[in-house]
Amino acid sequence: MNPSTNDFDYRSILGAERRTSLTFSQFLERFLEAPNQTLKTSATMILEAVKHFGVEAVIRSGEPCLRYHIFQDPFSNGINSVFGQEFCIKRIIDVIESVDKESGPRRGIVLVGPPASGKTNMVDLLARALEEYSQETKQKQYSFFFRLANGHGRELELRSPLMPNPILLFPTTLTRPDGSVSRPRQEILDEVQRRHGHDPDFSIPSYYQHATLDKRSLDILETLRQHPRNEGKTLFEIIEEYVRVEEVEYSSARGKGISNIDDMRQLQVQVRPISLAEDDMRLLNDHLQGKYMFRYEGALLSSNRGLLHIHDAFSGDGDRASEMEYKPLLMLLGSGKTSMEFTQASLDTTVFLTTNLEEMNRLDQQLTSSKLLDRIEKVPVNYLLDAASEMDILKRDITNVRERYQVDPNLVRIAAYYSVMTRLFPPQRSSFPPDWSAEKADLYLSIPPEKKLFIYASRSEDPVQTIAQLPPWHPFRNECARLGIDLRDEDVVNQLVVRHPEATSLEESSLFTNEELAIIDDDFMRELYHERYPKEGRYGLSIRQIQNIMRNTIANSDGNKVTVSIFLSQLEKVLQEGPHVHHWLNLDAPQRSSDRLHPRTIGNVILEEGAGNYGDYAGLIQVVKGIYHETLRQEITVSTVDRDPERIEKDLRKYLQHALLDKALENKAFAHVIVPRYTYIDPETGEKVDKPDYEFLRSLEAILLQDATSGEGRKKLAQKFLDLQSEGEINIEESKPVILSRNDNLLAGFNTEYTKLLSHRKTVEGVSPEELRDAFFLRQNNPEQYEKQSAVVRDQVDVIQRNLGDRFDYPEDIALDTVVYALRKEIIDFASIIA
């Protein structure tokens, strides 16, 4: 491309300049004007960085929680995103908040959990957020360096690896010429308190009241004070002449405010001599006569004012971590200091440690570890229990695969369902809330793995209402209040809440009866989740292991199509190979089976009593097969019947409107009051409708109801609508009848009825079920013979394949294979779909 026509300016992208430095007096002017900007601790900086990138809310198991955007990795296009760990992240934020507010002793935050649960990614994203946030022009943090000059243009800059705050140049005590002792640090802090103490958000962290500089910085200051050329100068004048204040930018790569280590021995501070050129050494000796200079190195120093991440913290040499190795950590978490050159320096570091369950258990059992255990806060980071979030990870992993292969649209879903079910524990509680009925308690205890799976991943039909019904003391309310989010404003809440596109309602899963759906509420879901926390998710199939199985699925494909059936075969192969090949099959997991599982049928898979139990990896393959088969039955049925979803929705709304009119007319005494509530103007004819269309009602009841003659089914559906509306489960647009409302969640409450109408048998002229079945087999196995079939049969095959692609995202070849698979496994029978 001709450079003259190229709009891309490659020079400008590397055009950043070094930030200017300030004199000490210039810094103090800024400090006195806005001390809050300077008096930030590491915890404050991390919290501000997290909040700076934004937040949204999700509902998990009936519980609202905040999802901070930094954990979606906005820095690298989501490559290192952490999905579904909102409860864990809240614990982390709570601990940092307590440190920031100095509401308790300093604690190291230990993220503990099984391998590949996202622990390291969480800390890495916190570090990256801190790094990016510190580069924002409005968020200036300052450090200082000594600048020595010879008057001929040569300068030498001496920096401390601690990036100390310039406020620490004010000594805590100072002897005046008359022998009296003053407290310069306290005096400057008292002055800013006098100026800004009226601001409720202003506070002075105790760190800045008591912290001291490192020995080398103090030695330099003292040597400069004693130098003959500085005789008669005050400490302020010396600082003004020799010190420059500069803006701080955190950097993981350069070890500035952020340190990452994988060996506790790297916590030790190293003291090394400075190697300088001859001219620089002459300059140094000119100002610091007789002073042999050293430099300090170490992870603790480089993480000052920021974040220290210790990977695999308690592995140590041999079987356990040595107390000698983590002694520097004990000092840091105990006194906020580190030892260097036979003295101590104050540090302000937020410490994160990541470790697995085995290493943490070994530390717990060490007799000498109690001092460390008292100074850490454990945060469990387990495998995901939300299948929708598990899908997010798997989708990210196969992004490139989709460019080279045709991928079954159900592959990621079924893989996520299986992996999550292997991690679940059965409900076993012995006592229940006093307002629970016996039926509710019995349902709770008999929940099988597949139902628990869908409860954990269910879509909240009205998240705004879920949040509105939270008690005043709920932690979510407090968390939002700290962020300035007004939960009383419905528009604010609507914008805050996000809905996962892969989440399904319990009704859509086809696993729950109407009676069960009526019992399961937000309270039920919350109790189910919290009973097994934090054990649930520690065991089972890890995301790395499911990724390996997915890779084997791709490797065993035909080089073009990656299907669910291949994935299920790979799962069965893994179980056949056993724990000698796949170590996770032999992990020492606690007993997880339930003795309350009744015989059940999922799709076309029949499970006897106790089959498909918690922790039964082989049985759970049959469970996930049943879910997959039921999914195929619904998808192929809808694609075959080929009805317009919008038309079906309108028919359902019309049915409910007329059923309500019929119910209103039954109440003779109050009909004159109730009927007008359900009267409406027909948008197609413009006529007022105040009487039910009984012929229309009966036509739909022939599809919806087993007994369409007694009228009882119609009454139940009308009452169901009224109950859901009064309980806030469905919300019809204000001042609109149900038939005219559109911006609502009606289908969430009537998904079963909607699906029945959508998949009702269709009459196809000139095509028999047998001909259609044979045509699919011929198209796959004998294309020449297929072309000899009648045009109307081939057209119907095309319609089904096209609908599978348009409605459910099937690639053309996989759509054909899927229908043939469903016919072979007797998942579908065209005789029950078309007439």
Residue ranges and their predicted role:
Residues 28-835:
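Conserved ASCE/P-loop NTPase catalytic core
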